[in-house]
Amino acid sequence: MGRRPARCYRYCKNKPYPKSRFCRGVPDAKIRIFDLGRKKAKVDEFPLCGHMVSDEYEQLSSEALEAARICANKYMVKSCGKDGFHIRVRLHPFHVIRINKMLSCAGADRLQTGMRGAFGKPQGTVARVHIGQVIMSIRTKLQNKEHVIEALRRAKFKFPGRQKIHISKKWGFTKFNADEFEDKVAAKRLIPDGCGVKYIPERGPLDKWRALHS
C-alpha cells in the first residue's frame, strides 16, 4: 500500500502532535539538510536576501520541503555557482500525521473493526505554517536578484496553497536594514559573527565600550 496523498493532510485541524514518549514509532522526516550552498560565507559577502512567504495556514509535508529544497538548490548552483549563495529552509516538520489503515481485500470485514478504535498509527511528519511565515530564504550577491526570484518561483510549485516571493530590505539573514548596516558596522555598533552579527547596545559598562574603540 502506497503513501496516502498529502492533500489529505493539507489543513491544520488538530492540535500540534509532536514525537514524544507517548507518540512512538514515527518515521524519519524526508528532509534532513536545512542549510545549503556556502553556509559559512561571512555576513558582508551576501547582502541580498529573498524569502518565500506562506499566504495560507496549512501543513507542508517533509517530502514537499525536501523537493523544494532540491529544486531551488539545483537552479541556484546552475545560475550562480555552488559557492554563490546560501539557502536556508526555515520550517521543520515536527507535527506527526496518522493513518488508520483499512483492508480492501475480500473478507476484510471479518479481520478488521472499521471505525472502532480508529486512532491511527504514525505515517509521517509535516510542518505547520502560518500566514506570513517564511518557508525558505536565500542570501546571495546583489547581482543575483533575478536568479533568487526564479529559484523561489520554481520551488513554489512543490507546495500546495499560495506563496509569495519577497525581496527583503534587511541585510542577508540579519534583522538590520541594508541601508544602515554598513554605517553601524563602521561605527562598531554591529560586529560581524559568521552569517549573523552581534549588536552592541549604546548602554552598558564603560570598559566594554573602551575595549571596542581602543
Curated annotation (Swiss-Prot):
CDD domains: Ribosomal_L16_L10e. It holds the Pfam family Ribosomal_L16. GO terms for biological process: cell differentiation; male meiosis I; ribosomal large subunit assembly; spermatogenesis; translation. Testis-specific. GO terms for cellular component: cytosol; cytosolic large ribosomal subunit; endoplasmic reticulum; nucleus; ribosome. Disruption phenotype: Spermatogenic failure and male infertility. Spermatocytes show defects in the transition from prophase to metaphase of meiosis I due to impaired ribosome biogenesis in late prophase spermatocytes. Testis-specific component of the ribosome, which is required for the transition from prophase to metaphase in male meiosis I. Compensates for the inactivated X-linked RPL10 paralog during spermatogenesis. The ribosome is a large ribonucleoprotein complex responsible for the synthesis of proteins in the cell. The male germ cell-specific ribosome displays a ribosomal polypeptide exit tunnel of distinct size and charge states compared with the classical ribosome. Belongs to the universal ribosomal protein uL16 family. This is Large ribosomal subunit protein uL16-like. It comes from Mus musculus (Mouse).
